[in-house]
């Protein structure tokens, strides 16, 4: 299988809705118990692409395999140098086939280039595959919130994994919005997609 990456568009919202909805209903990978509607997902894509990368993985036939994106960690502006990551594979996508790794090989260097200092992923403690993926990219556990969520009749623990991308300059340059460097991401994706 060949994994191809591209930048998301609002037209991807139905696929993202269906994928995320699977995890909302059938897993504890997200603590969300309600899947936003398709238009909400489309709005999120439009909004996030202003500042953050939002990537889609497909196979050589164009079949949707999954997505990864960055978003604000918290709404307060003092947190603007930290991005929170989301990554989900389509329910029928093959596991342990490199989809998540390829998405992060594109996403993390680009967030570094934009000037983010840290990225954070909040992962359910029982999601060993996601924990292993993040560890393999140099994420470390920053916090463990025991029984911080309740879903499907059970208490769940969340693990906060953090990776430093850039130094903590006392006078950091502003984050470069994604809209201003999208062409660079297109070039990076073309190079990654050309790899065997």
Task: Tell me what each language-model feature is.
Residues 17, 21-44:
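Conserved GNAT-fold acetyl-CoA-binding loop/helix
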Residues 174-196:
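Short, cationic low-complexity segments
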Residues 111-123:
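Conserved GNAT acetyl-CoA-binding A-motif
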Residues 4-16:
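A short beta-loop-alpha structural element at the N-terminal edge
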Residues 97-98, 169-179:
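Short, charged, solvent-exposed linker or helix-capping segments at domain edges/interfaces
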Residues 69, 120-123, 135, 140-157, ...:
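Conserved catalytic-core motifs of GNAT/GCN5-like acyltransferases
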Residues 96-109, 132-136:
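Conserved acetyl-CoA-binding loop-helix of GNAT-fold acetyltransferases
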Residues 36-94, 104-105, 164-166:
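Acetyl-CoA-dependent GNAT
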């Amino acid at each position: 299988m060949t994994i191809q990456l591209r930048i998301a568009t609002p037209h991807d919202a139905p696929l993202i809705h269906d994928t995320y909805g699977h995890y909302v209903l059938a897993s504890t990978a997200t603590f969300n118990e309600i899947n936003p509607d398709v238009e909400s997902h489309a709005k999120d894509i439009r909004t996030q692409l202003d500042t953050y990368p939002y990537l889609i993985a497909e196979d050589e036939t164009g079949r949707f395999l999954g997505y990864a994106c960055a978003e604000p960690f918290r709404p307060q502006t003092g947190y603007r140098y930290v991005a929170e990551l989301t990554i989900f594979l389509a329910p029928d996508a093959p596991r342990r086939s490199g989809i998540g790794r390829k998405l992060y090989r594109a996403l993390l260097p680009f967030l570094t280039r934009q000037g983010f200092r840290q990225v954070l992923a909040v992962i359910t403690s029982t999601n060993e595959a996601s924990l292993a993926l993040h560890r393999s990219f140099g994420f470390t556990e920053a916090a463990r919130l025991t029984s911080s969520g309740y879903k499907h009749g059970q208490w769940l623990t969340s693990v906060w994994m953090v990776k430093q991308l850039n130094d903590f300059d006392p006078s950091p340059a502003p984050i470069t919005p994604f809209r201003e460097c999208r062409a660079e991401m297109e070039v990076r994706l073309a190079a990654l997609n050309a790899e065997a």
